[in-house]
Amino acid sequence: MTYRIHYEVRGTLSFLSHLEIMRLWQRAMLRCHLPIAWSQGFNPRPKLSLGPARNVGVEGLSEYLDAEFSESVRAEEVMSKLNEVLPDGVKVLDLRELAPGSKMLEAVINEAMYKITFLQGLPEDAKEKIAAFLAAEQCLYLRQSPKGEKEIDLRSYVLGIEIVGDSMFLAVKTGSTGSLRVAEFLTVLGYWDIIKDIKIQRISLFVTEGAKRNTP
């Protein structure tokens, strides 16, 4: 049986990388002695699958993990045992059993919602800059990586932006085709210099099909 675990990552643990979060979950499963299923081969691993990678330093308020178990176990037991051993900053919110043959998280999640809060107040030019960004056909950005430089179109990933008070709500495409990094978006807006005064949270992940938008 497989459970889809809905959880959050807050505070200093948001600075853990995708790989470090996976290791955290592996250790938690072992510590609470749940009957997790293991892969076959020379280097067996717990059968766990995370949703789309979250950028380091970005809190995740609605994250997902698929966990396969070798025998039946009650949802209440899984949630209770995990929350007993997980460190402060990571918490299971709820979980549900998946039907056999369900697609993996990375294959179905295709939209993310971010909340970008300006702790010193929304810049006076924010609305003007957002309007210009949305009106543009392209917004090319040179992304640096260990493999070299790659030019990407940030505008093509953005589905919508809404300003509420001192916060921006940014809806973006995500999934196997990639996504933008919020730090890149803030850089092209000219806000990199005040990044330390900006709080970034990934508040939702969605499965979007046409006009329908559902949680995983």
Residue ranges and their predicted role:
Residues 7-9, 67-73, 116-122, 170-174:
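Short beta-strand-to-loop capping motifs
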Residues 14-19, 72, 76-77, 124, ...:
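Ordered, soluble secondary-structure elements with a strong preference for glycine-centered loop motifs
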Residues 37-69, 99:
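Short, charge-patterned binding micro-sites
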Residues 61-115:
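Ordered, amphipathic secondary-structure segments that act as subunit-interaction surfaces
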Residues 77-86, 126-135, 184-186:
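Short amphipathic alpha-helices in soluble, non-transmembrane regions
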Residues 135-216:
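Core RNA-modification/binding signature centered on pseudouridine synthases
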